[in-house]
Amino acid sequence: IEPVSGAGPVPDAAACGGGSSSGRPSTSTGKTETTTNPDGSVTKTETKSDGTVTETTTNKDGSTTKTETKPDGSSKTEVKDASGSTGTVKTDKNGQATAETTLSSKAVEDAKKNGEAVKAPVEVEASRDSNTAPTVKVELPKNAGETAVEIPVSNVKPGTVAVLVHPDGTEEIVKNSLPTEDSIRLTMDGSATVKIMDNSKDFIDTRAHWAKDAIDFVSARGLVNGISDTIYAPNNSTTRAQLWTILARQNDADLTGGSIWYEKAQNWAKDKGISDGADPNAAINRGQIATFLY
């Protein structure tokens, strides 16, 4: 970086332990600085006179990340990964985020070939409030069929869920959305828009319970509810018939009809090889159920 008059020499970035950099002094229209990072990527930082900062990083594999941050705190990040998938995250000055991602045919094909999920090139932060939860619009290639997709989440927990936003505005928790170490995973059959929420329940009797993570997982998805808004009763027992019903509900089985309330769930469990259908009234611990489902 060239020294500014009267300010003395500015040390080279490499001498300070970072990558090399070059640029020009501040002008009425702003400043531009380019840095070569230790991993070989190159970052170009442009600062406009109004305080807007645009940072663009180009990696050795050709992928790029461009983030524009305005003085009011709003920002837009655009990503294109090496497979050709793209993603954009817009965050307004109040912190409300919306994201869009288009997954490339190459990314989908490679993931399916390896038995993996396609990771979307966006990252959002889950919210406990549906009104402020980030929305993510996911575009899949035509004729992609059922595709496992991972949406990176900065604060993922066992109670983090994807919520499907239908075209009419109604919302539905995706029961099979699964938290991973750094994302939420769901299976999609075509393009869709989802919200990412922390739907964990605050049960006072599970805060220090050994099955807390499992209980957070199942209660957030409505698979096993508490006996009230604040009590889960993890040590209470339930029956095998109730467990069959929970499992069938998790898999969206049709449980209408039947001569007794659990008959359809019992038949479903037998058909799937989950249970022999015996002893429907035998007891099982609610904490054990949660762990089994988790």
Which residue stretches match the model-derived regions?
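Short, polar/proline-rich extracytoplasmic segments that appear immediately after membrane translocation
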Residues: 3-30
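Long, contiguous ectodomains of secretory-pathway proteins
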Residues: 1, 5, 23, 36-172, ...
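Solvent-exposed serine/threonine-rich low-complexity stretches and specific carbohydrate-binding patches
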Residues: 173-179
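Glycine-centered loop-to-beta-strand initiation motif
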Residues: 95, 179-184
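Positively charged, hydrophobic/aromatic-enriched amphipathic segments
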Residues: 30-32, 37, 218
